Amino acid sequence: MTPRKPFWQTKTLAEMTVPEWESLCDGCGLCCLVRFEDEDTGEIIPTRVHCQLFDERLCRCKDYPNRKKTVPDCIKLTPYNIEDLEWMPPSCAYRRLHEGKDLPLWHPLVTGDPESTHKAGVSIRNQTVSELSFKDAEDAMDFVATDLMRDRGDDLYEPEEG
């Protein structure tokens, strides 16, 4: 008997159920970083500054269901806007699947371990500062972090022996 392929290998993003869609999030936190756009080049510049609702220890939104009330410009990812979100990290599951790639080896759906993103060193856990730390939003430019956007989707995953 042939084993069934996982849902992300058999369904398009638009065909996924809400729980399947939500489970694609690996909890890296990279989408919760404050970014700036270079007015001259249009380049997106990420920083090590996170959204006020981001829990830096858990790498999750503190109020996900109601986040738009506090952060009106928070972008909700959908199968219909993912292609317009070029600022998403190349290792993001939503972006990778949209581009026809598979999930990274370190993704929790692949490993079965919800901590695998952190163990693989892909998340921003405890590496950022809250946007609430600044009086002037432009001060976040002192924390530019282009290194965080490198593609880590094909990185090997070698879990530590327990």
Curated annotation (Swiss-Prot):
Q: Which residues form a coiled coil?
A: none
Task: State the similarity comment.
Answer: Belongs to the UPF0260 family.
Question: What's the protein called, per UniProt?
Answer: UPF0260 protein CCNA_03385
Origin species = Caulobacter vibrioides (strain NA1000 / CB15N)
